[in-house]
Amino acid sequence: MLLHCNVSYYTSTFSFISSSLRRQDNADDSQDTVIRRRHNARSISLYIRHNRDLKLNKNPNESQETFVPPPPPPRRDLDGENRSKLLELSLVTRRTPQFPGSIYAQSASDADIASSLPSLRNFLGSDGDDDGESEREMIVKALEIRRKVTKEIIKESLVRKGRFGITYATNVTDRLGDFVDHVMIQAAALKRLPEFSESRFNLRARTVIEDSNFVPLVRWLKHHELSYNRIAKIICMSKGNLDSIRIMIEWLKSIHVKGEFIAVAFLRSGDNILQRNREELNEIVEYLESNGVRRDWMGYVVGRCPELLSFSMEEVKSRVDFFLKMGMNQNDFGTMVYDYPKIIGFFSFQVMEKKINYLKEFGLSTEEVGRLLAYKPHLMGCSIEERWKPLVKYFYYLGIPKEGMKRILVVKPILYCIDLEKTIAPKVRFLQEMGIPNEAIGNMLVKFPSLLTNSLYKKIRPVVIFLLTRAGVTQKDIGKVIAMDPALLGCSIGTKLEPNMRYYISLGIRFYQLGEMIADFPMLLRYNVDNLRPKYRYLRRTMIRPLQDLIEFPRFFSYSLERRIIPRHTIMVENRVNFKLRYMLACTDEEFERRVRDKVERRERFEAGLDSEDSQPSDENISDQEIAFSDEAEEEEDLTE
């Protein structure tokens, strides 16, 4: 009811307004008074709608007429620049807005968006006026424009269907050169099919992209932590067969290849990896597994040496036999490949033979080279000219003989792999600045090759500063201490040097006395404190010796309590003789027995009155060479590095 009232009201209002307007329009000119009516927003909208309906009713047949496009203009001779512009307009997918009055302006009401544009045939070979070179240039330009169109279609598919960002889609598309050409060729080939004979290029290109499952594959590869650069390279490697990528990745995952190494295995295993038979790849994996490479190691090995996947089975067998003939067993070979996977597939046979022959020049046999490579296979990755020869010359400069170089190679082969200028030379210069001569430095390196692997600023310098400031070693003796025991530079300050220093200070040894003891016997700071306590307790309580004897002979702590100190002290007590600690311990058993007999004979002769006390020989007549010789024969079991 309310709706009916409103309609009646609007109808009456509109009739009244229309009648008033008609009266106003048909009024006589002689009329003196003109009544002008003002319309509000509601009435004026009704008036405008009424007039529009009247105009449409006057020509009812005009709206049913169909638009007939004008005939195409005759072909005109255009210069190269205009031809390129028109060519691009005829190929691009998205049209740029044209200014009013443009010849090739397009509107959204066109039935075919390309109806107002010139045909591509108008440019290529319809007339024989242009020469062949110009036509070839136009064909090349047409292909470039079509390639740009294909890129835009691929980018649009990634953004709309794959929900990728514009930046990511652009980065992927810009690197898909081969795949763009593949899509362009396949889209052109679809025009031969009846169902696509009348379709446009854009539709055919989208059909090719959808049928190849391109967008889901990109999403799947991104899920496997592959960068857009590697995704594009892998897709280009497939040559349009995108299904082979999924099959290959599933196989790599079956042998435990993970993360970014999946892309590494693709890109470094050769262009034919997607065409290889899976049975051949499984045969290679099983052969390596039978020679010591565990199944759970296989992903690590293949991910870091994907060249294995490009080898034939015969070449893999020859490479494995190359190392097994050097005396390696299967366990050594398996651990060697796991430690350095490149050794099995990255280097050629000529390069490996050359490096093995160079290692033999140090005096190593074939079996020793095999054990060396099994222990440190990274040697195979070092260059002879850039690493080994400069290092050998530097060792000769320090006075290290060939045997010393061989010992360094066997004990610490990693020294032949590190950089000479950045790692080794600064440490040698630091030792030279402490006053250590080159020959002594060479002996230090032969004795303790690990010195060159320690950090200069985190290990070596802090230990030197500790010896100077906390252990009482003077600047005059610091070079001597380091030269005598370079292993000190590899000790931890917090767990080894600091506890030992505090223990000696707790015994009553003064700061400067401790420095003198260390200068005399630097290994004092490297012993285990738990092994030092029973020796000191026996010295003070059983032997009843003063602390000064220990200060004068700090090597006392280097001898075994059960095998040397207690047996010799027992012999001295039984024979009622006494020696200083130096002459009691720093000799062999035969020499000690001879000294005891001589001491007993002198005492008996003195008691018999045959010799005076002044005529008895002193113990100081024993030379330091005998002490040094006996120290070399002593087994220092209490020392812990």
Swiss-Prot record:
The annotated region (Disordered) lies at 54-80, 606-641
Any one Gene Ontology cellular component term annotated for this protein: chloroplast
Q: Which UniProt keywords apply?
A: Chloroplast, Plastid, Transcription, Transcription regulation, Transcription termination, Transit peptide
Question: What is the top-level taxon of the source organism?
Answer: Eukaryota
Q: Name one GO biological process term.
A: DNA-templated transcription termination
SMART domains for the chain = Mterf (SM00733)
Molecular function GO labels: double-stranded DNA binding
Task: List, as start-end ranges, the regions of compositional bias called Acidic residues.
Answer: 610-641
What happens without the gene?
Answer: Embryo defective. Developmental arrest of the embryo at transition from the globular to heart stage.
List where in the cell it is found: Plastid, Chloroplast
Role:
Transcription termination factor involved in processing of plastid transcripts. Essential for embryogenesis.
Classification via PANTHER family: CGI-12 PROTEIN-RELATED, TRANSCRIPTION TERMINATION FACTOR MTERF2, CHLOROPLASTIC
Q: Which family does it belong to?
A: Belongs to the mTERF family.
Q: What is this protein called?
A: Transcription termination factor MTERF2, chloroplastic
